[in-house]
Amino acid sequence: MFRRILEIFKKGESEELDSQEKFLVGKVRVEGKLRVGPWDAVICEVEEGIVKIGYKLKKGRKKVPIMKIQKERKDIEFAIPGDKVALILDGSIEVESGEVLKIYST
């Protein structure tokens, strides 16, 4: 299990980004969006890479930090390909079902 996670981390692609963003570490396919208290939650399935708390979800030029990740209503530290999760965001982003969004490390 840990070996697979390390392989996923090593696959991160380097792209020209601002000083806050360094690596593309994953992609998620959006299934929906909810409001959880004062925050937005994006329901999605991880397609590639790894998603961790503190990483940023990016659509176009807008990037929003991931504040919390939940799987089956339990908080988790990270998600890997195949996981269906809710990404609780520290901000708002407009998404549509079926969209593929990128995840960047900081």
Annotated model-derived regions:
Residues 2-50, 56-106:
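Beta-strand/loop-dominated core regions that host nucleotide or nucleotide-derived cofactor-binding catalytic loops
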